[in-house]
Structure formats: structure tokens, C-alpha cells
Amino acid sequence: MAKKIDGYIKLQVPAGKANPSPPIGPALGQKGVNIMAFCKEFNAATASMEPGLPIPTEITVYADKSFTFIMKSPPAAFLLRKAAGIAKGSGVPNTTKVGKVTRAQLEEIVQTKNADLTAADLDAAVRTIAGTARSMGIDVEGV
């Protein structure tokens, strides 16, 4: 018989830097999960990733206080800021452009996010990421 699910927790945790401080500790503590066990498992699972990369994580908590977690790919906005070499997007994206990305850079981001995108093919996925870039005030070349 399958375990009874007690709840879900969605967090963005930096790769390799999970610790019991907020926001992780309080979120897991409310559900009665062993916080240190999660931190150790998460840090071990993200050891091969770039430290500090924000990883959206969905934690499933079961009635016996055990847990499993699913890690998604980093947010497109973070990857776009990194590719464009900027700290943050534009406050007025249609007026002020803050950086540039090429189609090759967009394709690289699509390869990273491929599992989480619902696009039918590479071109559609590139257009999706290009739209995110435009909404951040990043100029897109070649799309």
C-alpha cells in the first residue's frame, strides 16, 4: 500500500547550500520533517551542480514524517541573467534594455531546462525563453 501523503512544500533552495535556517527550517518544521536529514540529502544530490544555483524543489511529506523531493531545473530568469551578465532585469523592459543574448545562448538555456519545458520542439522552446528574456528587458538576437 502506498504511503499517505501529508502535504507538499515548494521551495527554491540554493544548490549545495541547504541549511536549517529560514526559509527551509520553518517550512519543514511545520510538517514535522527531520530538517537535517533533508539538508544532507539535498546537498548530496546537488553536490555536482554549481554552488548557489537556485533549484526549485518540491518536497512530498508523508504521514509518517518521511519525505521525498523532486528537483527541477533552475528558473529561466536566473539563467538569462547569467547569460547576459547582468544582476537584474530592467524595471521598464520595453524602454530600457539591460543586456543581450544570442540564439546560441538561448539554445543552451533550453538544453538546461528541457525536462521542465512543455514546448513541442527546440524552436518553440527557444521562442518561449526569448519571450522571458524580452519581458526582462534583455535584447534577443537571431530569433
Swiss-Prot record:
One Pfam short name: Ribosomal_L11_N
Protein's GO biological process: translation
SMART domains in the cross-refs: RL11
GO molecular function: large ribosomal subunit rRNA binding; structural constituent of ribosome
GO cellular component: cytosolic large ribosomal subunit
Modification(s) after translation: One or more lysine residues are methylated.
Top-rank lineage group of the source organism: Bacteria
SUPFAM superfamilies tied to this protein: Ribosomal L11/L12e N-terminal domain, Ribosomal protein L11, C-terminal domain
Purpose of the protein: Forms part of the ribosomal stalk which helps the ribosome interact with GTP-bound translation factors.
Alphabetized PANTHER family for the sequence: 60S RIBOSOMAL PROTEIN L12 (PTHR11661), LARGE RIBOSOMAL SUBUNIT PROTEIN UL11M (PTHR11661:SF1)
Stated family: Belongs to the universal ribosomal protein uL11 family.
NCBIfam families in UniProt: L11_bact (TIGR01632)
Protein name in the entry: Large ribosomal subunit protein uL11
Native species: Psychrobacter sp. (strain PRwf-1)
